[in-house]
Amino acid sequence: MEFVVKMVERRKVKITVMKRFNPSEVFEKSPVTPVNPLGECELFSDGQEFLVREDGKMPEGFCTSAWHTIFCNVRTLAFGGDLPWFKEKGVAISCCSDGLRPVVFKLERI
């Protein structure tokens, strides 16, 4: 029996920062007391865009923690896959794992 492996072309993925949340938008009363006052994530700006090239590396200046959280969806889109819970093809909405002040991203295969 012979197996043939076909390489799938990788595509670029655009990441757009849709919304940064302030802890007061997430909780009426914070479940923990931060060491320093927290506002919206300071690493991103709403509307900011990043490009993931065909090599799949994290874009320069992107938050490592957020990248770790959204990478599975980025990889799925880059290899031509789609998420079954969205009607739109080549699109995903993903969120970083900061539970107090999350950042929501739109991922688009281009």
Where in the sequence are the language-model features?
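A general secondary-structure signal for short beta-strands and their flanking turns/coil
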Residues: V8-K12, L100-P102
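Short, flexible N-terminal segments of the mature chain
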Residues: E28-G56
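A structural detector for beta-sheet-dominated domains
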Residues: T16-M18, R53, E108-I110
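Short, basic/aromatic beta-hairpin or loop at an interaction surface
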Residues: K14-S30
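Short, Lys/Arg- and Gly-enriched loop/turn segments at beta-strand edges
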Residues: K57-H68
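Short, compact, well-ordered microdomains
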Residues: A66-I110
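Ubiquitin-like/PB1-type beta-grasp interaction modules and other compact soluble beta-rich domains
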Residues: F3-V5, R53, G80, W85
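Long, non-globular segments of proteins
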Residues: E2-R10, R109-I110
